């Protein structure tokens, strides 16, 4: 199937009598309720269930192996190849399936808040609530922009279309396929809305580096003086909590690009976890869940329609999707200058990493590539005790290119813009998980504040004898003994043994990076 034929098929779909294009939020909410796709909550949000797929399905994600990208993609478990033949046949079947639907919902918008680098996108949805989701998550066009909008990538989403693995070359009934040549994302068999968001992020992680822009899985905020901070971290490290600062404006909570102009948000909304959400803990998120917002897999009281954020009957991965303008303390458009401070967050359950360390460029690249944190019991099936986990660049499921490409770009930008990088451990202190305790949030906030306002640039440091990290000896508002992890352990020999054990896990993980320069290994990693 040629690209021309793909466009003809899309044109027919978009011009069919069943295509509802660019409906407003109230219109989409009406459609969701009329079609029994969801319920209205007491705050005016739409609540929907995603069926058996309550999270991303990484084993069902494919990139079409096409001549123009075959030697660029880092093929493997994350980027699984599928043939053009399989894609073309499945794409044709999905289009025929959607043509028969009574209604289809189409959103046209953008990914990328910087107008110089934004990607025009369109999304064709079988479900009205999915279309409401993308309307809130991506960047919405003005009336004028809509008249000249030409899509650079199209998502075709048909959750009720099930693949046949024996015929379609998939691993299950679900599929998420990206064709870079045909500029199509094809999604079926799963109702989880996050697949649409993360597909566009994966695409931007391919397209932006080609323009010398670093794409990043991080949150970002900016201070009153225009100083920009990035927060990288895997689930459970405190990224959302620590980047939501009343004294700083939010640029974005999850996906960003770093160009020669500065930092920009890739999205136009937020996709926040809402397990155990309360107004006391996360007032910004709690208050954003109003009319037009989408709740995913949250249990709602049948009579009062009040959301119970503590009920994880369906999944712990309950989510809320809302536009950026639902939050008060934001920058719009979501662009800012070059980062002054970069924070890598890790929740170290072994309790051996310092609560804050200053990183050299090589150490920053090493820890960026490592993407370390601890998986805690309850976050995944089968995890009963904490396990060291490494997610390359703090976002390995979304990286189509070789990881070293992103790390090299980060190193270049750190050097060019003199960004200060810190590794912050929000995990355990005084012993490992089960013995020690979780790092005091007030102390972590004080350390981050000191990093942001430049106080740590002039403070005295000591080199950690196992990890080689520069550890500040004094931080305002934090007891000195907390800063050196060994001092918080009663059994110093046990500390050393545990630290060496973690250092060896870092080294073992890093062996997979065979294209990384020796400097990063020798100057960036553990020294014992």
Swiss-Prot record:
Q: Which UniProt keywords apply?
A: ATP-binding, Cytoplasm, Decarboxylase, Gluconeogenesis, Lyase, Manganese, Metal-binding, Nucleotide-binding
Residues that bind substrate: 56, 192, 198, 319
Locations listed in the record:
Cytoplasm
- What GO MF annotations does this protein's record show? ATP binding; metal ion binding; phosphoenolpyruvate carboxykinase (ATP) activity
Which positions in this protein are listed as binding Mn(2+)? 198, 217, 254
Which cofactor(s) does the record list?
Answer: Mn(2+)
| Matches recorded under Gene3D superfamilies | 3.90.228.20, Phosphoenolpyruvate Carboxykinase, domain 1 (3.40.449.10), Phosphoenolpyruvate Carboxykinase, domain 2 (2.170.8.10)
* Alphabetical list of Pfam families matching this protein: PEPCK_ATP
- Catalytic activity, per the record? oxaloacetate + ATP = phosphoenolpyruvate + ADP + CO2
Q: Which GO terms describe its biological process?
A: gluconeogenesis
Q: Metal-binding among the record's keywords?
A: yes
The UniProt family comment states:
Belongs to the phosphoenolpyruvate carboxykinase (ATP) family.
- What NCBIfam families does its record include? pckA, PRK09344.1-2, PRK09344.1-3
Q: Per its record, how is this protein called by name? A: Phosphoenolpyruvate carboxykinase (ATP)
């Amino acid at each position: 199937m040629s690209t021309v034929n793909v466009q003809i098929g899309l044109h027919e779909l978009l011009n069919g009598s069943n295509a509802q294009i660019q409906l407003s939020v109230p219109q989409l909410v009406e459609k969701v309720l009329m079609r029994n796709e969801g319920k209205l909550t007491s705050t005016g949000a739409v609540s929907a269930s995603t069926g058996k797929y309550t999270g991303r399905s990484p084993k069902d994600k494919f990139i079409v192996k096409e001549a123009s990208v075959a030697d660029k993609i880092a093929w493997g478990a994350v980027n699984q190849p599928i043939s053009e033949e399989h894609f073309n046949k499945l794409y044709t079947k999905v289009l025929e399936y959607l043509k028969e639907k009574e209604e289809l919902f189409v959103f046209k918008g953008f990914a990328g808040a910087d107008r110089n680098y934004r990607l025009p996108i369109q999304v064709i949805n079988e479900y009205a609530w999915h279309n409401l989701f993308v309307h809130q998550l991506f960047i919405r066009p003005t009336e004028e922009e809509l008249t000249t909008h030409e899509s650079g990538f199209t998502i075709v989403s048909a959750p009720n279309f099930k693949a046949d693995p024996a015929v379609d070359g998939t691993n299950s009934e679900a599929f998420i396929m990206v064709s870079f040549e045909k500029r199509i994302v094809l999604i079926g068999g799963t109702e989880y809305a996050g697949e649409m968001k993360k597909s566009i992020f994966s695409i931007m992680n391919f397209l932006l580096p080609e323009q010398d822009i670093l794409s990043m899985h991080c949150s970002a905020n900016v201070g009153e003086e225009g100083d920009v901070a990035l927060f990288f971290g895997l689930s459970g490290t405190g990224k959302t909590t620590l980047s939501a600062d009343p004294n700083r404006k939010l640029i974005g909570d999850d996906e960003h690009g770093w160009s020669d102009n500065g930092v920009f948000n890739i999205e136009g909304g937020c996709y926040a976890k809402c397990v155990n959400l309360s107004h006391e803990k996360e007032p910004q998120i709690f208050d954003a869940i109003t009319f037009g917002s989408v709740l995913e897999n949250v249990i709602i009281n049948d009579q009062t329609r009040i959301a119970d954020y503590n009920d994880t009957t369906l999944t712990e991965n309950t989510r809320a999707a809302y536009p950026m303008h639902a939050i008060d303390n934001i920058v719009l458009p979501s662009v800012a200058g070059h980062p002054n401070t970069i924070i890598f967050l890790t929740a170290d359950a072994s309790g051996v990493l310092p609560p804050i360390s200053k990183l050299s460029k090589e150490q920053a690249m090493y820890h960026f590539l490592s993407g370390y944190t601890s998986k805690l019991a309850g976050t995944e099936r089968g995890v009963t005790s904490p396990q060291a986990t490494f997610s390359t660049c703090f976002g390995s499921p979304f990286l189509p290119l070789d990881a070293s490409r992103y790390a090299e770009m980060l190193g270049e930008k750190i050097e060019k813009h003199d960004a200060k990088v810190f590794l912050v451990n929000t995990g355990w202190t005084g012993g490992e998980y089960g013995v020690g305790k979780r790092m005091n949030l007030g102390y972590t906030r004080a350390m981050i504040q000191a990093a942001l306002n430049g106080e740590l640039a002039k403070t005295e440091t000591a080199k950690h004898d196992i990890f080689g990290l520069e550890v500040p000896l004094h931080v305002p508002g934090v007891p000195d003994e907390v800063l050196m992890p060994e001092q918080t352990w009663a059994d110093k020999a046990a500390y050393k043994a545990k630290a060496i054990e973690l250092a060896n896990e870092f080294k073992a993980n890093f062996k997979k990076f065979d294209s990384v320069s020796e400097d990063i290994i020798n100057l960036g990693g553990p020294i014992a």
